[in-house]
Amino acid sequence: MMSHPDRADMPDTHFYAWDARGHGQSTGARGYSPSLARSVLDVDEFVRFVAKVAQVSLEDIVVIAQSVGAVLVSTWVHDYAPKIRGMVLASPAFKVKLYVPFARMGLKLMQRIRGLFYVNSYVKGKLLSHDPERIESFEQDKLITRAIAVNILLDLYKTAERIVSDSAAITLPTQLLISGDDFVVHVKPQKQFYAGLRSAIKEQHILPGFYHDTLGEKDRALAFDKMKNFIDKLYAAKPYVFDYSHEDQWSPSADAYRELQAPPKARSLEEMFYSSLSYGMKTVGRLSKGMCLGYETGFDSGSTLDYVYRNQPEGNGILGRMIDRHYLNSIGWRGIRIRKINIQQVIEQAVAKLKESDMPIRVIDIAAGHGRYVLDALEKHQDIESILLRDYSDLNVEKGQAMIEERGLGHVAQFKEGNAFDYDSLATIEPAPTLGIVSGLYELFPDNASIKASLAGLAAAIPPGGVLVYTGQPWHPQLKTIAYTLTSHQNDIPWMMRVRSQKEMDTLVEQADFEKCHQVIDEFGIFTVSLAVRKQHG
């Protein structure tokens, strides 16, 4: 499409194209990317680059994407919640048609055995478009890679399933163009994705007779007309703002949270599965040190978190250590360890940002657990004025203070007991912090009132130009397993979580007068780490 921007008939609009044939022209193997998450980050970096070059805000940008690119863009909107004007998706490849039975299962097995290898696409140009010139271009273009790395193909399926099932988290104005005779991707997931979208501004158009290359079809003028009309309407109105004021009460995530509170139906297969799993964890599972610690302090406690960070299997005998290794390798704990790395990197960026602004570096972590990730990130810096770590738990304060002393940081760091949701105690912190950190806390509490009080307290304490590092959990694949088998630090009750979409979390931060400027997310799409700057007063 971007080879013919004039077809959009929008002469007053600047078009920027990202040439991703073969995953771009960077060095390295064609058809390969380290992960689909890295490719999604490419989208984020490209759009922000365009905004900088064009000297416009993200709210002035509409993103158009097709096929795999449409999956990347919809994932970006879901995971990063960018403040763009809207998006147009053409034939998103949410489910590629694999005509060999059990192909996906076989690819997974072969990947485990062989590692990285490439899968060739045998799709012919004549199955993509009716346009002879477009067909010829596809067949002759040497930059179009027929082979795709197996990790990307499998990641595409996995990520697409996540985004389609959780499309209710997307509240951005969206137009979906579906090709009526698509031989490459399935139509059903596209319709499911669209049905879940919660923006009041959305359009779905089915284009009869169109092959997969929607924007490169012979009659593509039909698609371009619909696209132009949609984009014109977006630019003619003010940027659409979704109302998140009751998200913790009336939303799909609130409904899902309430559903968790109802146990599985008695004597159902689901009930028998979770009962058996819970029984096994409470009996044989106690050979694992990690599980024992979870039952003693809560699986969401600072002590458990620190144990997961250390990632050293311990237990009674060989069996205990094997169980502990399996426990530590669960997708949630793997994501937590990636989050630790991401937090440390974002803290580094926060420190650099403060230095650029000639601001003193005074740190507050309002729910630090044992404080390991903060101390790991900051102990090498010599120009930190103060580090104040706080937590509700006496045990965490004791363990954290011991860690401070072990590292010889007692001259600059201290650990105190404190309530992370108490506005007054946060607003009056002395000396006034310039770097606030909230990691893994808000995800544990379903209501937004307490989060608002916490963020307001931090906003009152942090001066304009100061920064906030905060985490989010827009999605989790094990919510039921956690709710029905693990216990919380809160009086040993079941550990139930309400996921907040990234846009909901960012909105809460923005309402507290912080402006998000950077974000990272793990490859599973579970945990985010963001950086925001305290706005000027007034």
Q: How should each PLM-predicted stretch be described?
A:
Residues 465-472:
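Conserved beta-strand signature within the Rossmann-like core of class I S-adenosyl-L-methionine
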Residues 172, 186-195:
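Short alpha-helix in the alpha/beta-hydrolase fold that links the catalytic acid
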Residues 170, 176-178:
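Short beta-strand/loop motif that positions the catalytic acidic residue
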Residues 24-54:
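Catalytic nucleophile-loop/oxyanion-hole region of alpha/beta-hydrolase
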Residues 370-383:
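Conserved SAM-binding loop of SAM-dependent methyltransferases across substrates and taxa
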